[in-house]
Amino acid sequence: MSNPSSPNPLRVGIGGPVGSGKTALCEMLCKRMRDNYDMAVITNDIYTKEDMEILLRADALPAERLMGVETGGCPHTAIREDASINLEAIARMSADFPDLDLILVESGGDNLAATFSPELSDLTIYVIDVAGGEKIPRKGGPGITRSDLLIINKTDLAPYVGANLDIMAQDAKRMRGERPFVFTNLRSGDGVETVIEYIRKQGLLDEKRKN
């Protein structure tokens, strides 16, 4: 966690492997938070703006509040080693919308070693999914062990892939210690309110609005 008490918009970095549900999470957060908070989203893709276009088609936010960044290389470079392209996008969004409360920064799909630079993200959320197998939490990696919040998505698929959610919970707790995790089914919305409450409280969103 960086400095959520800053007067600038809260920046929430959302990472995880390809297909884990990062864009679905962005969509759900936008649709459930946009009436109460001034929001924008920045998506990262290597050669396209596909994730931004998905959010646009889903009417997650107005087009001017969605920005797609083409990283042109390894996805984790743009969120860690050289975050300048994303920092520039945040600066542009903040200039266009001076009253922003919250900016979601979705990374391109990456491996378990991907992490956000502290200068880019105040809170980090890492999304994995049950379809990857119940062993995923115990594989570790910075995304699983050091993210502020771990999301284990697609719980509805557990019976079909032979994943035991109790074992995944035990492994997540062992790997993360006191850091929280939550099970979600983003298709149905299960668990989303828990994620929103975490962002609100840990990101001091309501305190920001008072100031």
Swiss-Prot record:
GO terms, molecular function: GTP binding; GTPase activity; nickel cation binding
PANTHER family to which the protein is assigned, alphabetical: UREASE ACCESSORY PROTEIN G
UniProt cross-references to Pfam families, sorted A to Z: cobW
Assembly information from the UniProt record: Homodimer. UreD, UreF and UreG form a complex that acts as a GTP-hydrolysis-dependent molecular chaperone, activating the urease apoprotein by helping to assemble the nickel containing metallocenter of UreC. The UreE protein probably delivers the nickel.
Role according to the record: Facilitates the functional incorporation of the urease nickel metallocenter. This process requires GTP hydrolysis, probably effectuated by UreG.
SUPFAM superfamilies per the UniProt record, alphabetical: P-loop containing nucleoside triphosphate hydrolases
Originating organism: Janthinobacterium sp. (strain Marseille) (Minibacterium massiliensis)
Transmembrane region(s): none
GO BP, sorted A to Z: urea catabolic process
Protein's UniProt keywords contain Nucleotide-binding: yes
Annotated protein name in UniProt: Urease accessory protein UreG
Top-level taxonomy: Bacteria, Pseudomonadati, Pseudomonadota, Betaproteobacteria, Burkholderiales
Family matches, as InterPro entries: CobW/HypB/UreG_nucleotide-bd, P-loop_NTPase, UreG
Positions bound to GTP: G16, P17, V18, G19, S20, G21, K22, T23
